[in-house]
């Protein structure tokens, strides 16, 4: 096979050998259901708890705030749909941007078909959200703001802390799709006022 120079790591990454080595025992030896009560479940249960603590530490979060899904798309779907359903008695308005991943945009379309209102913000020539436009888009019935941390096509990093502060000041939940950012730039969910964050291991050699 000829040598390949792979330049699409923003789409997915090669799993690092040490990750394969770390995971292999749970495919071949400690494969018990971690939610079960028998002894065979103890080792995978311990591994999941350790992974949860590690991820929480990397985000400045608490271990009980970390949930595992099958990937970034499910995480995005869950964040938006669960928030919309849980807060629909408070409001039905969601703010996002026109340059989000399809996992966000398609979910917003789904919610619009269910009666929710979605504002899609424009960005400037560099792909950055205009904070003044964000502030203008907020309504009394706004329940969620969802803005990706870093864009998967052009690499723009959004002013997440400032967006989080605006959301927090207005009592609005803030979600960020950080699939392209986690593991590459420092993230502290408390400092950035992030209520929900999506990430995915396959973007960082996992």
Could you tell me what each predicted segment is?
Residues 1-206:
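Pyridoxal 5′-phosphate
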């Amino acid at each position: 096979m000829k040598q390949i120079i792979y330049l699409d790591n923003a789409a997915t990454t090669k799993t690092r050998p040490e990750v394969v080595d770390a995971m292999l025992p749970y495919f071949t030896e400690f494969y018990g259901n971690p939610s079960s009560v028998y002894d065979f479940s103890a080792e995978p249960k311990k591994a999941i708890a350790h992974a949860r603590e590690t991820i929480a530490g990397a985000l400045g979060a608490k271990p009980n705030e970390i949930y595992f899904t099958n990937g970034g798309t499910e995480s995005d779907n869950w964040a938006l749909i669960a928030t919309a359903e849980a807060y629909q008695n408070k409001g039905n308005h969601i703010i996002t941007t026109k340059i989000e991943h399809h996992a966000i945009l398609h979910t917003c379309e789904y919610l619009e078909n269910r009666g929710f209102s979605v504002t899609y913000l424009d960005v400037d020539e560099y792909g950055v959200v205009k904070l003044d436009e964000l502030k203008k888009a907020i309504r009394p019935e706004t329940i969620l703001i969802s803005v990706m941390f870093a864009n998967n096509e052009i690499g723009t990093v959004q002013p997440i802390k400032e967006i989080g502060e605006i959301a927090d000041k207005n009592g609005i939940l803030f979600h960020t799709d950080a699939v392209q950012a986690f593991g590459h730039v420092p993230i502290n969910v408390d400092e950035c006022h992030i209520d929900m964050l999506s990430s995915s291991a396959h973007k960082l050699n996992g």
